[in-house]
């Protein structure tokens, strides 16, 4: 029987994390972080089943290399407490085969995130013993890309207000103006 589990995290410099380090961990690779000069080596980590970088069609092709992608993200974010990535860790059903896990994740990521302009770095882990705890790591860029391949603004909060039975969505700036009225 499939057991549901989903963990959602933010990779942020403010919490002492690095997008390059998180990507090296999930892909069991060795990546140099150009931002701080630290090399993150997780090549001895076991249990990697599959890994892939998904890009929108207008992203630079060199970003297929996860080291280049996440170093570009680190370079673009300037502040010491920048949010660098979103990470999701879903459990995978043991009733499915690894090929079915890949198909499930590929469809979900392409339709939910890449179609919205985000880059996704994905890996499936099945630690020892196999079939004991299969799960995926999905890292997403916080900023989507526009059609020219430029970073857009980070997602803006939208507030839903109900007044006299009428619902209306507001961005933070619109909400401040509406409050003044």
Q: What residue ranges belong to the model's regions?
A:
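N-terminal nicking endonuclease/strand-transfer module with a His-rich metal-binding environment
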Residues: 1-181
């Amino acid at each position: 029987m499939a057991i549901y589990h989903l963990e959602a995290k933010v990779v942020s410099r403010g919490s002492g994390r690095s997008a390059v380090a998180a990507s090296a961990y999930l892909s069991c690779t060795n990546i140099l972080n150009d931002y701080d000069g630290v090399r993150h080596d997780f090549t001895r980590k076991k249990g990697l089943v599959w890994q892939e970088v998904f890009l929108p069609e207008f992203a630079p092709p060199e970003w297929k290399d996860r080291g280049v992608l996440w170093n570009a993200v680190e370079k673009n974010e300037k502040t010491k407490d920048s949010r660098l990535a979103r990470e999701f860790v879903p459990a995978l059903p043991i009733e499915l085969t690894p090929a079915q896990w890949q198909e499930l994740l590929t469809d979900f990521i392409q339709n939910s995130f890449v179609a919205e302009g985000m880059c996704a770095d994905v890996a499936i882990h099945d630690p020892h013993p196999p079939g004991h705890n299969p799960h995926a790591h999905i890292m997403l860029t916080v900023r989507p890309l526009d059609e020219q391949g430029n970073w857009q603004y980070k997602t803006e909060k939208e507030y839903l207000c109900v007044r006299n039975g009428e619902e209306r969505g507001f961005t933070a700036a619109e909400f401040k103006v509406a409050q003044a009225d």
